[in-house]
From Swiss-Prot:
CDD domains: Tryptophan_synthase_alpha. Keywords: Amino-acid biosynthesis, Aromatic amino acid biosynthesis, Lyase, Tryptophan biosynthesis. It comes from the Bacteria. PROSITE patterns: TRP_SYNTHASE_ALPHA (PS00167). The alpha subunit is responsible for the aldol cleavage of indoleglycerol phosphate to indole and glyceraldehyde 3-phosphate. Pathway: Amino-acid biosynthesis; L-tryptophan biosynthesis; L-tryptophan from chorismate: step 5/5. This is Tryptophan synthase alpha chain. Tetramer of two alpha and two beta chains. The active site is at 51 (proton acceptor), 62 (proton acceptor). Belongs to the TrpA family. Pfam families: Trp_syntA. InterPro entries: Aldolase_TIM, RibuloseP-bd_barrel, Trp_synthase_alpha_AS, Trp_synthase_suA. GO terms for molecular function: tryptophan synthase activity.
Amino acid sequence: MTKDRIDRRFAALKAENRAGFVTYIMAGDPDAATTLSVLKGLPAAGADLIELGFPFSDPMAEGPTIQRAAQRGLKSGMTLQGTLDLVAGFREGDADTPIILMGYLNPVLNRGFESFAAAAAKAGVDGLIIVDCPPEEAGPLTDALEAEGIALIRLAAPTTDDKRLPMVVRRTSGFVYYVSVAGVTGVKSADAADVAPAVARLRKASGLPVAVGFGIRTPAQAAAVARVADAAVVGSALVDEIEAAAQLNENVTEKVLLKASELAKAVRSARLELA
């Protein structure tokens, strides 16, 4: 069962008393070969889990950085199947690092839930985050994913109240993704003082690790979140590096892995500073 990789990784992180570093990049940005090159380098750069976006024409939860990445991914010809092919390519050399696909419902719906889940499991996908699928409508997708051992990871936000929270975390597995700021990705900054009580509340409600994202751009912000959460997710800051390097005809893989390494070091040392 593929989601076991997620469970094993968080168990190992807990044993090491450190938070995980979760990276996000968009498939096909700027092209498939570069995405695969970055994917293969991320674990050595310090990524504990990897989120791989699949491009969609209307990414409503994303800020300008990820929207542009989705446009570049679509322009390069990236599809949902192409994204699965990238995961399969990554798995040829890495059987341990969990990979979570992140995107929107429409491409998965068009593929068919059972067909998608089977193909995702075969490729080596461990989890799925669907931004625009409310829990009330997620039953058939969850059934298909559970049959293949893939985690459906749900999003909780500062606006998720006590009445709604049980519905959000029901049938969630792997971890809970806490959206630390209201609004779209990569625009506002996460506030660790607000994050700590939210993480405690989500852990209690779900019994699962809590990863925090949507507002972590700097090593200092990543470290602050890593002190209180089970994982810190960084996306826009890495995608910015990809965009800038591609525009300047620089080595995209080299630049983004260097940035990932800086962030990973901050996450890994965060709790040591408290000791």
